[in-house]
């Protein structure tokens, strides 16, 4: 199926030509409408996960819907198709490159299991990148097909507000289109932040907008930042054999449980990723060899230092894509500190018929599944007589570092701040995955903790899991926590043996007890 889609993108075969012609006609039709104004029940600005989910749901409910989407090329010139950050430069390519790194580890373990594999194995960036990029392009195509099938009008235009009901869009050829709608949803997402105070940052650095679309290996790489994007990228780059360094100004994974975050970076350090902690870059210079000389300040020593790299990747956070929307012309309020759009529980902005969902909205998790669900629920409230609001509490997530970190609910710090140390009980354990034993893999950072209320029935406030397949493990327990599970109910649950997830239902040692939290056997 993927191969067929990719083939269609490169040059459609006969069986795909009717669908291709239909899509092309739709685009030409949108462009030719520049002279007149087109009206819709719903206009969605932004073709990412949340916006597409909202548009498709509204169309399913029989409404006339349009999507306006435009990708501003990165400073490096990277651009991509329909689908937003997740599909093109986020979750999907990131997880696939993470998988490439995991496969490298499995190949190195293979001889322990009887496979005669010549060592050392070599990784080919070009092969991986082409496969990942082709899959992404197939998803771009799939989104176009879905919009066509649901009769959603797609406009490849850069949209900005004229007034609270009207948007002006300009295509890549400079042709303008006017669109109006009874309801407008802003779902433009965000883009990586550049440290503009660092000389050479824009000219010589790249971001997550670029790394997945590189045709050649990035080589020796400096990743600047301590976000999950920084650690995930550094993790898979190290995993495929590249010399990788992470430069962090302060703590890793701000907003996550800090004990778990420290274990994540400890594991990465012990498996080859180098860390420059408490350091801030000051400037980048391109050398005659085409390498990049980076100068930074070490805050601990107060001294300057330099290093040479092939690639510098900025991963210092993201900014909402609101700069060119002309929000003020529609009277839409934003947070002046971060430029995110202020919304209420209904996802409504300061203008009642204009809404914002996903990463562009203030106070919302920057996660694809929340944007998708919020978009669907919004369409159902607008057009399907529903009153169900999006519940943003206890949203699970996973950081796809080499040793994955999955979590749901409160961190230990948040629980203590909210309820007080004396009212919080934390159950925890180190464990060794069965798969690690034969290959004698290091499992010193495989760790689980469950944050609970101390008083009966000991409501589970949060679960934190560090180990293989953390996303798969956390997803199931997220349902229990969402439903108000207690510690006793988790302990009454029978585990599936032998799995890592069964260690969660065996947690019996509390931090308060002071006992050693180490699992001593696989069947105990």
Swiss-Prot record:
Residues the entry annotates as binding FAD: 41-70
Gene source species: Mus musculus (Mouse)
Expression tissues: Expressed in liver, heart, testis and kidney.
Entry protein name: Thioredoxin reductase 2, mitochondrial
Cofactor: FAD
SUPFAM superfamilies (alphabetical): FAD/NAD(P)-binding domain, FAD/NAD-linked reductases, dimerisation (C-terminal) domain
UniProt keyword Mitochondrion present: yes
Pfam families: Pyr_redox_2, Pyr_redox_dim
Active site (UniProt): 497 (proton acceptor)
Location within or outside the cell: Mitochondrion
């Amino acid at each position: 199926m993927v191969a067929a889609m990719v083939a269609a993108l490169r040059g459609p075969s006969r069986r795909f030509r009717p669908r291709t012609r239909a899509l092309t006609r739709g685009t030409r039709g949108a462009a030719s409408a520049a002279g007149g104004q087109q009206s819709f029940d719903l206009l969605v600005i932004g073709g990412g996960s949340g916006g597409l989910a909202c548009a498709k749901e509204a169309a399913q409910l029989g409404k006339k819907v349009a999507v306006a989407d435009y990708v501003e090329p990165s400073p490096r010139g990277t651009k991509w198709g329909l689908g937003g950050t997740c599909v093109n430069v986020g979750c999907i390519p990131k997880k696939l490159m993470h998988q490439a790194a995991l496969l490298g580890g499995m190949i190195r373990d293979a001889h322990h299991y009887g496979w005669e594999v010549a060592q050392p194995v070599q990784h080919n960036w070009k092969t991986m990148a082409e496969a990942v990029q082709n899959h992404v392009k197939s998803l771009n195509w799939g989104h176009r097909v879905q919009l066509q099938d649901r009769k959603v009008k797609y406009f490849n235009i850069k949209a900005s507000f004229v007034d609270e009901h009207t948007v002006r869009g300009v295509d890549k050829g400079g042709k303008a289109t006017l669109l109006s709608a009874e309801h407008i949803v802003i779902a433009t997402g965000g883009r990586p932040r550049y440290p503009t105070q660092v000389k050479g940052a824009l000219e010589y650095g790249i971001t997550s907008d670029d790394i997945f679309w590189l045709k050649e290996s990035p080589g020796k790489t400096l990743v600047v930042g301590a976000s999950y994007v920084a650690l995930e990228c550094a993790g898979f780059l190290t995993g495929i054999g590249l010399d990788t360094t992470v430069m962090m100004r302060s703590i890793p994974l701000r907003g996550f449980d800090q004990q778990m975050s420290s274990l994540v970076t400890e594991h990465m350090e012990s498996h080859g990723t180098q860390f420059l902690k408490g350091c801030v870059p000051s400037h980048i210079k391109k050398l005659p060899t085409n390498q990049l000389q980076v100068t930074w300040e070490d805050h601990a020593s107060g001294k300057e230092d330099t290093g040479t790299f092939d690639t510098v990747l900025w991963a210092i956070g993201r900014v909402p894509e609101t700069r060119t929307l002309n929000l003020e012309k529609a009277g839409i309020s934003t947070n002046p500190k971060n430029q995110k759009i202020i919304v209420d529980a209904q996802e409504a902005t300061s203008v009642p018929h204009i809404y914002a969902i996903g990463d562009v909205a203030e106070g919302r998790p920057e996660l694809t599944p929340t944007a998708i669900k919020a978009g669907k629920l919004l369409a159902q409230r607008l057009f399907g007589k529903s009153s169900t609001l999006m519940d943003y509490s206890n949203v699970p997530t996973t950081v796809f570092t080499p040793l994955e970190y999955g979590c749901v609910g409160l961190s230990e710090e948040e629980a203590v701040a909210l309820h007080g140390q004396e009212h919080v009980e934390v159950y925890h354990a180190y464990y060794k995955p069965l798969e690690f034993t034969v290959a004698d893999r290091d499992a010193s950072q495989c760790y689980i903790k469950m944050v609970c209320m101390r008083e009966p029935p000991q409501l589970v406030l949060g679960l934190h899991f560090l180990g293989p397949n953390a996303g798969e493990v956390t997803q199931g327990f997220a349902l229990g926590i969402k439903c108000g599970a207690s510690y006793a109910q988790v302990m009454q649950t029978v585990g599936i043996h032998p799995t890592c997830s069964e260690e969660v239902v065996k947690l019996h040692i509390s931090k308060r007890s002071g006992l050693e939290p180490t699992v001593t056997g696989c069947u105990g």
